[in-house]
Curated annotation (Swiss-Prot):
Cell compartments where the protein resides: Cytoplasm, Cytoskeleton
Entry keywords, A to Z: Cytoplasm, Cytoskeleton, Repeat
Pfam families reported for this sequence: DUF7623
Sequence repeats (start-end): 1-68, 69-136, 137-148
Protein source organism: Trypanosoma brucei gambiense
GO cellular component, one term: cytoplasm
Ranges where the record places region Disordered: 1-22
Keyword Repeat on entry: yes
Name of the protein in its database record: Antigen GM6
Length: 148
């Protein structure tokens, strides 16, 4: 029998910049239902059920991204939602290397020892907020330069 981790190789390992392991997919009813159906279809007739299996894999991947967006927005609640008047969603923080590096360090420190690492976590949150404001200023100046 396949272990859950073995049968998830088709999933994006870092949806929305969040490691799959942090999404607790086994506890998500919708994901578990799709995963169980996929498992049965594979056991029954992998080739004959290939189309439905592929559809399920796409749906499971999309659902993991939805869960990751929720997790990412929760984990970013300390950020100013409108730095420089620009919505956070427009800043593409997941694609920014500096922000992603700080976010990953923050995530590790929280997982390791939230209280013991509180000072460093707070420093990172301030730096992440400042960086989101820098990105927003760049975005705002870019959009103004295109207007006549």
């Amino acid at each position: 029998k396949l272990k859950a981790s073995d049968s998830r190789s088709f999933l994006d390992p870092m949806p929305e910049g969040v490691p799959l392991s942090e999404l607790e997919l086994d506890k998500d009813e919708k994901f578990s239902t799709m995963e169980e159906e996929r498992r049965k279809l594979i056991a029954e007739d992998r080739e004959g059920n290939a189309t439905r299996i592929a559809e399920l894999e796409v749906a499971m991947n999309e659902h993991s991204h939805e869960l990751a967006k929720l997790k990412a927005s929760d984990s970013r609640s300390f950020l100013d939602p409108m730095p420089e008047g620009v919505p956070l969603s427009e800043l593409e923080l997941d694609k920014d290397e500096k922000f992603s590096t700080m976010e990953e360090e923050r995530r590790k420190l929280i997982a390791e020892d939230r209280e013991g690492n509180a000072a460093r976590i707070a420093e990172l949150e301030v730096a992440m907020n400042e960086h989101s404001h820098e990105l927003a200023k760049l975005k705002a100046s870019d959009s103004r330069s295109f207007q006549s």
